[in-house]
Amino acid sequence: MSDKVMQITEKSVQAKGICKRYKSFFGRSATILKDISLDIDASEIFGLLGPNGSGKTTLISIFSTLIYPEAGSLSILGMDARGNRDAIRRCINISTAKPNFPWSLTVKENLRHYGMLYGLYGAALSRTVQDQMEAFELSEFQDHKFEDLSTGLKQRLSLAKAMLNHPRLIFLDEPTTGLDPDISLKTRQLIRRIHDEDGISVVMSTHYMPEAEMLCDRIAFLRHGSIVALDTPQNLKRHLKLGERICITYQGEADISALQGQPGVLGLKAENGRMEIAVDRGEESLDGIIKLFSGAKITDIEIKEPDLEDVFIELAR
C-alpha cells in the first residue's frame, strides 16, 4: 500500500441532512436536494446515479465546496466543509460535465495556468503538464485553443486539469460524456488506475450504466432530490428482485396469459416476435416456459443476467 493511500482518512465524504433550494426569478423556491445523508469510504469509487434533474450535479457541487447547502452538515476528508474550504480545495479537484476554460488559451497554456494556480512552478509544472497531456492523449492538440476543441477534447482537458494538483479526492461529473468509445475506455482505465495505484478517492456521477457497474463499489440512486437506493450494484439487483431475463424469439402464437401465471415468472413483455420474460430462477424456469410455446416455432433463446440499467429503469419509475 502506498504512502498516499495510508494518508487518506477513513471517510472521504460524510454528509448528514443535506438540503438545497434554489429561488426562481419569480421568487418561488424549488427544493433540489432533500435530507441527503451518506458516508463515502476513502477506499471506494462511489457512484451517483439518477435521471436528469435528480440532483446529482448539485450534490457534487456541494461536496466539492462550490456551493453551500441550506441545511445539514458536511465533512470532506475529515474536515468540516464550512470552516475549511481552502484546506479542502487543496486536497480535492473536480471535472465537470460541461468544461469551461479561457477560450483564447491553448490546451498547454490552460494546463500551465491551472497548474500555477495549484502552486506548481518551473520543472515540476512542465513535467506535470506534459504527463497529463500524454495520459489523456492531448499532446498533439497542445497548441489548439480551447474554443476550437471538440466536445470530447474539452472533456479530456477537464480530466487532465483535475489531476494537476495530485488530489486525494476527485469528483467526476459525467466523466466520459462526449468521448469516443476508445477514449471512454481509456478514461475508465485511468479512473481505475488513479484509485487503485495512487490511492485517490473517486466520487462520480454517470448516466452510463455499464460504466457504473464496471467502476463503482457502491451507488446512490437519486430521484427528485432524495436518495432512494444505496448499495453495491450486485445488492441493488438482488434486493429489487429483478430476476434473470429469458429472451425468446419465435414465429407464431404463444400463450401469454398462461405465461403470466407460470410459477417463477415476475413479468414479461412481447413485441414483434420477441418476448422477454423476467424470472426468479432462469434455467429452472426454462422448461415450463418452453412448453407454453408449443404453438410457435422458437428460433432463438437467450438467458440474460439483470444489469444496472434494469435497476435504473426500475428505480426511475
Which residues fall in each region the model found?
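Conserved ABC ATPase "signature" region
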Residues: N93, R112, M116, A123-F141
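Conserved catalytic motifs of ABC-family nucleotide-binding domains
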Residues: H166
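Conserved ABC transporter NBD signature motif
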Residues: G72-D80, A87-I88
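A short, flexible loop at the N-terminus of ABC-type nucleotide-binding domains that lies
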Residues: K4-A15, R21-D35, N84-R85
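Walker A (P-loop) phosphate-binding loop of ABC-type ATPase nucleotide-binding domains
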Residues: P51-G55
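Catalytic Walker B motif of ABC-type/P-loop ATPase nucleotide-binding domains
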Residues: I170-D173
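ABC transporter nucleotide-binding domain
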Residues: Q189-D280
